[in-house]
């Protein structure tokens, strides 16, 4: 019995050893671990550190502290007679003398903010005694980032719903349109003054520090906020590699283009409506499928706050902006070239217009205007005349020779 069990144990041990050996040769041993909080990370071998945002920020009258990570809450400590503005419906709890707390609903520039798609309903909380409040958001995949403004550097908040709470008597927040940048102008807010800001982002929020002379390319849907510098961010597109296959051309498309039926059909309202629908579908595809090809280029010195979960391109770009970045409809470049060169139909000669009408009205248009002109010149150069029973060829001079003389 012992021998049998020993043989069985030996067989099982050898089978397990063989399986382990097979796994060692077939699979690579990879270890994935999260970076410690606050540790600097080198990006692609370039000395451009990416670090987590500070968990707390304090001023003389208030203090913001982020509790928990990544799905966190914001702890706000307010001194006496200090105002706290938080988005409506985000206040979780409050500690202190509740009888002294005054809460009012503030409507901040509803006309301008509604046009830009920025929330304008905020809750104003103040108390003559010190209090502590907890603020959170309804979305389960957001995290907080706190920013301390000392009056020397201004900030631009890119995402529409990124601003959650702020405090500071001299803090000024206004919606802005950056005319130099048409990609992320809608929903941006410029923050000036002194105070504390609480921003929220999808996923984790990280901070990127750029020194003078450094550049960074970021997707607009991942940028939460950035510091205002002398050089605003510019739209940027990576060079794409396309494979173009050359197929031997046929004369069928050229014959179809010469057909009068095809020309009349392309000039009809049905064709134009179908082309507009196709252009709208192409715009939607570029916004949803190829929208990741649109980037922003930042120049240092600057500080960027990026989120790990990007927003949709629809949230930061309008249809008009996508159409401007995408290719223009067919025919626009041709019309622009005609205006530039001044070649219009009115400038053409009577002979040119008559020749084009003759070629287009022919049942089988197998000749071009140039070919018809050459043919007419060849026929008009010589003529046969019968004189005294003999055939004589008399040559006539062309109009160009007469003009030269």
Swiss-Prot record:
Single GO cellular component term: mitochondrial inner membrane
Disulfide bonds: none
Transit peptide feature, positions: 1-88
Keyword annotations: Mitochondrion, Transit peptide
Subcellular location: Mitochondrion
GO biological process: inner mitochondrial membrane organization
Chief location: mitochondrion
Signal peptide: none
Family the entry assigns: Belongs to the AIM24 family.
Protein name: Altered inheritance of mitochondria protein 24, mitochondrial
């Amino acid at each position: 019995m012992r021998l049998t069990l020993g043989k069985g144990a030996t067989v099982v041990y050898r089978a397990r050893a063989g399986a382990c050996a097979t796994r060692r040769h077939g699979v690579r041993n990879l270890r994935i671990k999260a970076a410690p909080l606050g540790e600097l990370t080198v990006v692609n071998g370039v000395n451009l550190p990416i670090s987590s945002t500070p968990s707390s920020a304090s001023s003389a009258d208030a203090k913001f502290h982020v509790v928990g990570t990544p799905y966190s809450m914001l702890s706000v400590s307010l001194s006496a007679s200090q105002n706290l503005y938080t988005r409506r419906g985000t206040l979780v709890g409050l500690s202190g003398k509740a009888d002294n707390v005054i809460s009012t609903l503030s409507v901040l520039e509803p006309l301008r903010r509604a046009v830009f798609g920025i929330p304008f309903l905020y809750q104003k909380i103040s108390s003559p005694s010190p209090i502590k409040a907890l603020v959170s958001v309804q979305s389960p995949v957001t995290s907080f980032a706190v920013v301390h403004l000392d009056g020397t550097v201004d900030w631009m908040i890119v995402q529409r719903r990124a601003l959650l709470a702020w405090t500071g008597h001299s803090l000024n927040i206004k919606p802005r349109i950056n005319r130099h940048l048409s990609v992320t102008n809608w929903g941006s807010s410029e923050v000036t003054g002194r105070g504390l800001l609480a921003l929220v982002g999808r996923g984790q929020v990280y901070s990127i520090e750029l020194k003078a002379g450094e550049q960074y390319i970021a997707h607009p849907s991942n940028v939460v906020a950035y510091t205002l510098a002398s050089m605003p961010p510019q739209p940027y597109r990576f060079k794409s590699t396309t494979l173009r296959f050359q197929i031997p051309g046929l004369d069928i498309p050229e014959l179809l283009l010469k057909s009068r039926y095809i020309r009349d059909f392309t000039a009809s309202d049905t064709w134009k409506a179908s082309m507009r629908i196709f252009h709208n579908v192409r715009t939607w595809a570029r916004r949803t499928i190829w929208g990741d090809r649109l980037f922003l280029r930042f120049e240092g010195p600057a500080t960027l706050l990026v989120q790990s979960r990007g927003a949709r391109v629809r949230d930061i770009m309008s249809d008009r902006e996508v159409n401007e970045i995408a290719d223009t409809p067919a025919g626009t470049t041709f019309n622009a070239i005609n205006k530039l060169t001044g070649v219009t139909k009115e400038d053409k000669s009577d002979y040119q217009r008559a020749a084009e009408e003759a070629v287009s009205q022919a049942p089988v248009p197998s000749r071009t205007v140039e070919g018809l002109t050459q043919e007419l010149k060849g026929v008009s150069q010589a003529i046969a005349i019968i004189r005294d029973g003999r055939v004589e060829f008399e040559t006539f001079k062309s109009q160009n020779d007469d003009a030269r003389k």
